[in-house]
């Protein structure tokens, strides 16, 4: 729906909402039976009163929109970091200190309701964790912001004193590492913290084997390419400074400054047998050429995040959040073809851009009664992007202004065994470019979450949501670059948003030794952005358009079992069937596949061991069908004292691990490629996790809101 009206500039009091029904739940406290009572402010603004209790056989509680996983003594003592505890949830894959979902949906990670990163979780000890909330569909304010699934980690109260933590991972067979360090000092009413994470990567032996065929002009171009070994490098660094001021349990002020930097260089070199066939005469010529593709980018991004929260009573609470983000980006894409030492084609696309954005959000929560909550929400964002794009000779300046306003409301409650949450949002998205002028769109987005609890061990749930995805700034510029000597890619300044609607029904069961969660998911993407091909001036042109229509069905079963009472051994499995169909763009395509993972873990008092195997499923990519890497790993670690853990492991990519992609029949382009990184075969990794803390426990407040603009403006 389009309108010239704009909701930009909304500055409103927003009502926070409980995404699940209010219920008293039994905390599993500590493994020794220690009593620990606290109020945990969860992601949606919901307040769960965790009553004092000792451990029971139950490790999972069921709510209308999420499941609450409790950690026992074994879980706290045998996992090195909070990030590793996410492996307890079937369907979440933790690899290289990054947490992702095996079903391909996005995963939002929160800490006490505050969006955080995998790197930050790698600097949090499991001893600090009280519980983990897992949302198959994110709560209202996050779902309306485009989040898929979500986890929210609830921690214990911090204390007066300080803490230092190191998390070091280094590969001894290749230049690769995930290293992080943090220090926090907590005074009576103030916490000061600094955190650094760095991920330097250099992978030798990288190459792509490729078959390519397409028409351009009156010729058919066919290339059989063999990848030549090159070095792929990617360096990521992030520093954050935190200041939290807590006047009392009902008031908090938080300010955070972050500085992120990334530099990536991903060249591809290939020796090719090139055949050009005249479609009129059917005459052909064959020659040997060398192709080189250049893909380089760099960005620097500072951000300031200020958050204020005030709880006026048990029934009313107000939160306000302001975020300012800037990006300074540079990128280079090039295609070069040589016959021996003679250049046949040289094309370079350079982009130099800056982006400035601001976010204002406020949340106000109102508890009507113990079983009923009502809320409203609002958020406004605005950004300005400047891009200079050129080929080294001609430079084009493109400015893109975007603004977004969102109003949402939600009502939640419970009756008998039923709990429910119903919400809706009205969203305005507007943008303006020099090439296409002003565009305004208004969207309506409903949200329904239902749950029926049969007993303390089992429940059934249903979720429905509708979300809008906006195109990235880099997609709407004026840049162009070559993928092959007759294949040119152009940006599209007239891209529009597209909508995803998904429905999920599932069942969950748990007892002292078993947890299973089968579910069925169907989603539909309307007006999806996909590549469209055309022929002009003897070239094949690729340009993104809002022409796709995708429908997908997924059926999955996740589970975790502890078969022996006296042996700390557990098996986590996840299996999924995926059926996707995409129409539009002149090349309909579909894919059906099976995928999943299995992880076996031994958790002793001092020693831990873990082995995992991942079988990826196929999915529809931009111009074809892709398959992820098939790999496995094993690792072991030993705990030394209370503060140190050292370990070693090996990751082994199996023969079919190579990431592959191919186009569907009928596509204007026939392509099949396989990528490989031989230097990462049999990667041996050493780990060291050290944490040290001092001080005493005090009361503190949980923080709930944070935002970030994750679109750097790059392609």
Go through each PLM region and give its residues.
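Outer-membrane beta-barrel signature, preferentially recognizing the C-terminal barrel domain
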Residues: 468-517, 524, 541-553, 674-682
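Face-selective signature of the C-terminal outer-membrane beta-barrel domain
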Residues: 236-262, 292-437, 443-446, 453-457, ...
């Amino acid at each position: 729906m389009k309108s010239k009206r704009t909701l930009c500039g909304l500055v409103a009091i927003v009502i926070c909402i409980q995404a699940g029904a209010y219920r008293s739940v039994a905390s599993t406290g500590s493994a020794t039976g220690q009593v620990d009572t606290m109020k945990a402010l969860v992601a949606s603004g919901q307040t769960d009163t965790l009553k004092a209790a000792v451990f029971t056989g139950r490790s999972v509680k069921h709510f209308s929109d999420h499941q609450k996983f409790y950690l026992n003594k074994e879980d706290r003592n045998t996992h090195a970091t909070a990030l590793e505890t996410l492996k307890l949830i079937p369907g979440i894959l933790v690899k290289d200190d990054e947490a992702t979902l095996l079903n391909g949906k996005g995963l939002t990670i929160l800490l006490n309701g505050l969006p955080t990163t995998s790197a930050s979780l790698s600097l949090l000890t499991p001893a600090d964790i009280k519980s983990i909330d897992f949302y198959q569909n994110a709560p209202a304010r996050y779902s309306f912001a485009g989040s898929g699934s979500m986890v929210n980690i609830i921690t214990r109260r911090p204390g007066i004193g300080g803490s230092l933590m190191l998390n070091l991972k280094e590969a001894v067979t290749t230049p690769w590492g995930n290293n992080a360090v943090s220090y926090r000092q907590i005074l009576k009413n103030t916490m000061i913290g600094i955190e650094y994470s760095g991920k330097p990567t250099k992978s030798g032996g990288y190459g792509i084997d490729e078959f390519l065929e397409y028409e351009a002009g009156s010729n058919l171009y066919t290339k059989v390419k063999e990848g030549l070994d090159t070095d792929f490098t990617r360096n990521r660094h992030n520093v954050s400074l935190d200041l939290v001021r807590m006047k009392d349990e009902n008031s908090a002020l938080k300010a955070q400054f972050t500085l992120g930097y990334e530099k990536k260089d991903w060249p591809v070199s290939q020796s090719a047998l090139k055949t050009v066939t005249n479609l009129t005469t059917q005459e052909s010529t064959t020659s040997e050429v060398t192709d080189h593709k250049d893909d380089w980018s760099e960005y620097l991004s500072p951000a300031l995040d200020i958050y204020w929260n005030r709880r006026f009573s048990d029934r009313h609470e107000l939160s306000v959040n302001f975020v300012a983000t800037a990006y300074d980006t540079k990128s280079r894409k090039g295609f070069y073809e040589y016959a021996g030492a003679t250049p046949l084609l040289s094309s370079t696309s350079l982009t130099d851009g800056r982006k400035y954005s601001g976010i204002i959000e406020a949340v106000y929560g109102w508890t009507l009664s113990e079983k009923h909550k009502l809320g409203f929400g609002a958020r406004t964002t605005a950004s300005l992007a400047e891009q200079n794009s050129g080929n080294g000779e001609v430079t084009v300046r493109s400015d893109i202004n975007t603004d977004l306003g969102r109003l949402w409301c939600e009502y939640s409650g419970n009756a008998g065994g039923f709990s429910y949450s119903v919400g809706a949002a009205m969203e305005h998205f507007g943008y303006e470019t020099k090439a296409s002028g002003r565009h305004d769109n208004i969207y309506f987005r409903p949200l329904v979450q239902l749950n029926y609890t049969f007993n303390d061990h089992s429940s059934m749930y249903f979720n429905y949501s509708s979300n809008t995805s906006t195109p990235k700034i880099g997609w709407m510029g004026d840049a162009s670059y070559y993928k092959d000597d007759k294949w040119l890619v152009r940006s599209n300044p007239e891209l529009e948003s597209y909508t995803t609607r998904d429905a999920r029904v599932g069942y969950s069961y748990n007892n002292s030794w078993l947890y299973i969660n089968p579910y069925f998911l169907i989603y539909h993407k309307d007006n999806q952005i996909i590549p469209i091909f055309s022929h002009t001036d003897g070239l094949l042109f690729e340009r993104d358009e809002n022409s796709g229509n995708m429908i997908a069905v997924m059926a999955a079963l996740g589970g975790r079992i502890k078969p022996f009472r006296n042996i700390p051994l557990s098996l986590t499995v996840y299996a999924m069937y995926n059926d996707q169909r995409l129409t539009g763009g002149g090349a309909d395509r579909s894919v059906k596949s099976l995928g999943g993972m299995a992880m076996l873990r031994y958790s002793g008092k001092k020693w831990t061991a873990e082995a995992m195997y991942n079988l990826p499923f196929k999915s529809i990519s931009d111009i074809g069908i892709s398959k992820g890497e098939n790999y496995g790993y094993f690792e072991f670690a030993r705990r030394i004292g209370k503060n140190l853990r050292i370990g070693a492991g090996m990751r082994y990519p199996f023969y079919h691990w190579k990431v592959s992609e191919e186009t569907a029949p009928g596509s204007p382009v026939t392509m099949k490629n396989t990528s490989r990184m031989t230097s990462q075969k049999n990667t041996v990794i050493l780990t060291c996790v050290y944490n040290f803390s001092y001080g005493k426990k005090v009361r503190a407040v949980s923080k709930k809101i944070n935002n970030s603009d994750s679109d750097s403006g790059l392609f």
